Amino acid sequence: MASPDKKSSLAALTLAAVGIVYGDIGTSPLYTMKEVFSKEHGLDLTPENLLGVVSLIVWGLIIIVSLKYVTLVLRANNRGEGGIMALMALALSSVTKNSRWYFPLMVMGLFGATLFYGDSVITPAISVLSAVEGLGVATSAFDPYVVPVTVAILVGLYSLQARGTAGIGKWFGPVMLIWFITLAVMGVVNIIDAPYILHALNPWHALHFLSGNGFLAFIALGAVVLAFTGAEALYADMGHFGAKPIRMAWFLIAFPALSLNYLGQGALLLLNPEAVTNPFYQQLGAWSIYPLVALSTMAAIIASQATISGTFSMTKQAIALGFLPRMKIEFTSASQIGQIYIPAVNWLQMIVVVLAVIGFGSSSNLAAAYGIAVTATMMVTTVLTFFVIRYRWKYNLILCVAATGFFLVIDLSLFSANMLKLFHGGWFPLLLGVVLFTLMLTWKRGRELVFENLQKHAIPLEDFLASLFISPPTRVPGTAIFLRGESDGVPHAMLHNLSHNKVLHERVVFLTVRMMEVPYVPKADQVRIEHLGDDCYQMNVTYGFKNVPDIPAALDLAKEQGLEFEMMETSFFIARQTVVANPVRGMALWREHIFVAMSRHARGAADYYQIPSNRVIELGTKVEI
């Protein structure tokens, strides 16, 4: 029997998961039904079509969210961490680097991750915009103010990011719980008025709708997918809450509430087809519009916050895995290490979100932009999951194909339906994804070219030290730490120091930082020291992609292995690389120029590794790619 403390902890995590994980999918009822039956889709609002659409949505929640994500994908975790970056790292670890699958899997996972950035722009825009549009249901006099009010809310939200969410974050769970209870109550009220809608629970109506409406049903699928946006968040946030609280929050709260509300909106439209212009806000009558606008705006802000935080987390992982240059990362909570803020990402995302709101102008226009990136990410997740369960878990091939193939057919159907919206806004998140994909691959390849160049001119460290101490230079008091990449040979900073200063510190440490394709490396395994002789040491510091790189903390850990450091007697020598594009070799010249620009704006190693600036000596070196 579980102890009371464990039960209360599980309940707290479940409530927190309701607030963070389900904000996106929880706000989908604001716009999904409205979009399915919009005039542009040409689908008649008949009782038969209503039953079919509601049945599609409810069974989509069962198959896509409950079975695929909650039951299968949550099991494919990378040491407890989820998200497409973690899944990509797990899939890559399932095959060797020489495997024919390695590069395609990396490209696929990377493209899925960049599509997440496209989603992260659309989610705040469509969530807040659709919430504020409720004012227009009350009176058309509010229509001119919908976009300005939305922009003001979003600018305010992004402006507060630097302060962190630790203070208001504790209210996310209770507010979203009230939101889901409200969804359920509204649904039940309308179902009581038109219980015939419960026939939609029979999947035959979904199948009959698809077979009986031909191309119109195919078009409708592109709008139905709006009910499943946010499913990826279930997996992405697993590291914060664990699989069990996420599952409990889904099956006990989110899924019943969403199903009841979609059934309720269907019941409302059976009785009052004119409500199709915005069925969500007309479920309880005119008296409820203003309270619902207030509550839905809070829910939309929470959904947006979860997406923004997810973007910060994804960026940090991408930096650690070598797909993006180092950036300034601020920690906004002393107690919660996952609470981070990346200024460059925050302001750039805010600008793009505001432009999306102004450019598209309404949630209906944004809805056209939403589905392609979401369904493409779903496909990538399914394929990566196949490689994990087949090559890492060693499940039977037929079982793996059957399990993931079923979901892949659904993903492909939804993706194909959304491709019809490519020229009606679907290009927007795809363009964002392609731009970021190009930048990430360019950075990854550029770093490889820099490494190859340095390797060509590298002097083996052991041979160099052996020859150096035949006629040793003058030793001066203190400790010198030279940052050195894996297999880099003698650090350029050391060669420059010996060339210019003609001296060597009495203790020399070569420090190599390695990032592993796992979320976390325990402190006990982070530091390894090898004695090279003559008071020279090789110190390897290993982090996972969700660890916080902290060299001073690593030096403290070195005490346990007999190497103590006094910071005021320690100097860090770091080579500052100036990268120069070479038209003869390497990448295409335009990509090389992009890489050079990214390198120029990358955060310095000293800042990124939290090395005190007054202990750092930077020495320049030029590298051609």
UniProtKB/Swiss-Prot annotation:
Transmembrane segments: 10-30, 50-70, 102-122, 135-155, 172-192, 214-234, 251-271, 284-304, 340-360, 369-389, 397-417, 422-442
CC per GO annotation: plasma membrane
Pfam families: K_trans, K_trans_C
InterPro entries with a match to the protein in the record: K+_transporter (IPR003855), K_trans_C (IPR053952), K_trans_N (IPR053951), Kup (IPR023051)
Entry keyword set: Cell inner membrane, Cell membrane, Ion transport, Membrane, Potassium, Potassium transport, Symport, Transmembrane, Transmembrane helix, Transport
Primary location class: membrane
ATP-binding keyword on record: no
Localization per record: Cell inner membrane
GO MF: potassium ion transmembrane transporter activity; symporter activity
Membrane topology of the entry: Multi-pass membrane protein
Reactions mediated catalytically: K(+)(in) + H(+)(in) = K(+)(out) + H(+)(out)
Recorded family membership: Belongs to the HAK/KUP transporter (TC 2.A.72) family.
Protein's UniProt name: Probable potassium transport system protein Kup
Annotated organism of origin: Herminiimonas arsenicoxydans
